[in-house]
Amino acid sequence: MSKTKRSMRIASTTKASLPHTTRSHSWPMFKQQLVLLAAFAALASGPASAFTGMIARPVFRNMPPRSLQASTTSEELIPREVLFGNPEYAAPAISPDGKYLAFLKPDDGVLNVFVRRIGEDVDRVVTKDRVRGIRGVSWAEDSKTLLYNQDKGGDENFHLYAVDAMAAGSEAVDLTPFEGAKAQNKITNKRFPNEVLVAINNRDPTQFDMYRVDLPKALAGDALGALTLDTENPGGVVGWGTEDESFEVREALVINPADSSSTVKIRDSKEGEWRELITFPYGEEGQMIDFCADGESALLLSTIGRETTALLKVDLKTAETKEVIAAQDNCNVGGVFLDDDTKEVKGVSFNYARLEREFFDDDLKADFEKLAELGPSNAEVSIASKSRDEKTWAVSFRRDDGPTEYAIYDQTSKSLSPLFVSSPSQLSYKFAPMSDVRIVARDGLELVAYLTRSDSSKPTPLILLVHGGPWARDYWGFTPTAQWFANRGYACLQVNFRGSTGYGKSFLHKGDKQWGIGTMQHDLTDAVAWAINEGIADGDNVCIYGGSYGGYATLAGMTFTPELYKCGVDIVGPSNIKTLLDSIPPYWGPLRNDMLRKIGDVDADEDFNKAISPLYHVDKIRAPLLIGQGANDPRVKQAEADQIAFKMSEKGIPVEYVLYPDEGHGWARPDNRIDFNGRTELFLKKHLGGRAESFEPPEGATATFPLEERQDIAAKV
């Protein structure tokens, strides 16, 4: 194994929780990211990658002593503000030259970007957001410019912004200043430090063209003049990638709407003709990771000829497999760690229930062993960021019962220095453990699930927390919502039902056409039965709770298995699949047919749509329902919540409906997040009998109540 010290790149193959901010090459996200773009995406996602997971926590060993012991017992109520307020620190990113650290931190109660010199504790704010906050940041390769994405009111039309971190008082510049357009697929390159590539759909809202940005020109005030069309989308391209040496766009992922296949296309130069490298038919999963340094090979992930994704080295001309580098039988490759210059694979990760790694480089393995030695026990260590020379790392430690903690790892001296804790206020409280468990569905399929509870001495009320997507998954690790439920006296169960990602193509596609009345929902029902049979759950007090697809599953559970649930909480969940798909954003257009294949053809089969859409089964609902919705949600429109809430109200079925006019697909503003959770907590106490903190709406919350407004209008008429 090579021990040459070169810059290494971390390629994620799993869902990104925030807008993509990887420093070098964004291609590795394509296939999974596109599948998830076509979905409604989880409101709360797991770590972005086994190597880049931005979540952590711990008591470090062999470091200056610091007490992180909880000062309370599990009986004390953990305030909602502690669980759901803004983190004090998040998303550390080391500048390529290794001198500075950028991170997120509240400024006047809103998350903004700060910078400090590494080794110092003086923080300087460099952005001035006063509304929704910034949720991710990365460095340009010039080591002075910071890049971040921002939308308006949750509309998800993210623009790419840049700010000069070294110039005091510098104003952020919108690098993609097109009204109504969306920017994504950002790529930077160390050989071209003054340039950024970004895809924008300003020419055609359904197609993303690749633009090249002249950073110095943009920062000087000419953002439009700094943009040059680099590669126009010929149609069907849903993602772009580059060759590192030239920084030319030489990779494209093309979706064929007719058969839902995806094709990786490549070219030899910017002027060259595109040619097909490999096609993944519907039912197969795969993506390109990178070109190899030899110019004759590429790294791919593929399920073709196997059940789970394997990491392959393939011939660039024939796509013939030269080497199977890594694979497991029960789960996909989750992350790939590359040498940025040689493209040598230094490590890969897998995650069936817990994170595992396989190393191909002795130095990298030794570094992770050292981090495990210095960090806490029972924690998953990840690299959040690295300097270009790899001498300075920002690392995090993920465990199940405490807040994120970050440290700086000196790769030369093999020493670890505390950096910051994401939410220091959480250190004062005792959290519940999370256990990974196995549940066997009625047809014998094994499901991985995660159980969080404070009281294991007797059956307690159960909350089934359903992840979004549905083409996503839950992970082991600290989850504020699960901890909240456990602290209030409930057991919380999270299930990776069939159709979840990460477990191979058969597991994924066993969810096809199985929404609502099919086996995807049966898996959730079977999980509840398991918890009851195991003495975990009080079968008379079960709640189903979820966001996005999880919100749909809540509505489905309330309508199709009404005897099972005492109450339900639906956050931005669709109630009518046909109207959902008729109102998706235009840039999802190339993926609509793929969604029809996965969900079922609700366009052609009206009866099928009615069968799986909870809106048509409102009469079956027996239990109270709480609905939360963002008015600006571009994925699940407000109408999805309106129509079922109004129909339930008309029929006298108990329903509460809270609408936030300044939110989208979930709650970005802490005041709204805390507000809705406060209302949820009182709802759960009323119907399940758990504990609740007193509730006063936060001053900045914007909750409105459409059912009450409708009744007021009706009364006046």
Regions found by a protein language model. Give the residues of each.
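Active-site-proximal cap/loop segments of hydrolase catalytic domains
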Residues: 497-717
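N-terminal organelle-targeting presequences
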Residues: 58-79, 99
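Peripheral, non-catalytic segments that deliver or gate enzyme domains
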Residues: 84-90, 108-113, 121, 128-135, ...
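N-terminal chloroplast transit peptides
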Residues: 1-4, 8-21, 30-55
